[in-house]
Design a protein with these regions (language model features):
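Charged, amphipathic alpha-helical segments and their flanking helix caps
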Residues: 1-42, 46-146
Length: 146
């Protein structure tokens, strides 16, 4: 597997193991139709590999070391009532951030992991709440093995 794929797999593994402050009921890399989720599948997230920037770091006569800065997009959904949907969205965001901060090297595959953007549906999906978290990961690899 490539380092980028190993990082994506690490994010799935970490998110699947979360139990506090909330337990994620559905964690996948495949987008899903939120209207098809049962009550028992909330909160649910999917993770997608996003854009990446690559630059050469070092070159020798036999290899090139590159740095990749890749974005991974986490899209999540919670379900609540009129009095707690914003709280549930915030709990989901906090859960994701806490889990990712537990190992910013993504199992040794990355130099650093940062959450660079958080956005919400701002109530447009009520009674479902949606969030989007952009996770930026910096890593190095040998050219030909991203």
């Amino acid at each position: 597997m490539s380092i980028r794929e190993n990082i994506a797999s690490n994010i799935i593994t970490v998110m699947s193991a979360v139990t506090s402050p909330i337990t994620l009921k559905k964690v996948t890399r495949e987008p899903f139709d939120v209207d098809e989720l049962s009550e028992q599948q909330y909160p649910a997230i999917f993770i997608q590999s996003g854009n990446e920037q690559r630059t050469d770091e070092t070159m020798t006569s036999t290899s090139v070391t590159r740095q990749g800065v890749a974005d991974f997009i986490i899209v999540g959904f919670v379900k609540g009532s009129g009095t707690n949907i914003d709280t549930k969205r915030n709990e989901l965001i906090s859960t994701i951030e806490t889990a990712l901060e537990s190992d910013r090297t993504r199992g040794g595959y990355a130099k650093i992991t940062q959450i660079v953007e958080v956005s919400t549906d701002e109530g447009t999906l009520f009674p479902i709440g949606g969030i989007r978290v952009v996770v930026r990961v910096m890593y190095t690899y040998t050219a030909g093995t991203p």
